[in-house]
Amino acid sequence: MRRGLFISIEGSDGSGKSTQLENIKKYYEDKGVKILATREPGGTEISEKLRSILLDKDNSEMSPIAEMMIYSASRAQLVDEVIRPALERGEVVICDRFIDSSIAYQGYGRGLGDMVEKVNLYAVGDIMPDLTIFLDLDPALGRKRVQERYGTESMDRLEQEKMDFHYRVYEGYKALAKAYPERIVSIDASRSIEEMKDDIYAQLDRLK
């Protein structure tokens, strides 16, 4: 059986990942293709428990290395339990965040550097996205959208980080897009939902 397609979607909070994930699901469902949508951190019972630890505002003392290791543990569990089996069944898998999030957030945002990529490549083994959609949005606009939609009180531990952290993350994403142009496609997320969707669908058409 032919291996399925693996698509990840990346970007800062407020960039519209959840909305575009639903659009990608619809793209494949309309074609009668079986699709599995999941998220990081999370996606399995164990990974969701790790997610609650990572995003809990009370865990402000978490060290950058501990944060990196918990993210990679969550990812390893998701790959082994959900993503790899689905790809082996020939399904399309779309994941809200994947390895690039760790490289951007912990590698660039926390300043841990190349160690993050090495640890996470070990966690995922041979499973990497065929296409990564990076929703490119200035972090200040992303934060404004999140605050307008949910309010400041609902922001999680990472969302509450200072803006200089989020700009380091953003620079990390841009560096990744430049380093891996054959896999990562940047989509201008300052535009309308429909304009973004049209550009994403054009990229999905290219995967055929």
Where are these regions (language model features)?
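A glycine- and Lys/Arg-enriched "phosphate-lid" helix/loop adjacent to the NTP-binding pocket
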Residues: 102-171
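Hydrophobic positions on the alpha1 helix immediately C-terminal to the Walker A/P-loop
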Residues: 20
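Walker A (P-loop) phosphate-binding loop of P-loop NTPases
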Residues: 14
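Hydrophobic anchor at the beta1->P-loop junction of P-loop NTPases
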Residues: 9
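ATP-dependent small-molecule kinase phosphotransfer cores
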Residues: 31-124
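NTP-dependent small-molecule kinase module
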Residues: 23-25, 140-208
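Pre-Walker A (Motif I) flank of P-loop NTPase domains
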Residues: 2-6
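Conserved lysine of the Walker
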Residues: 17
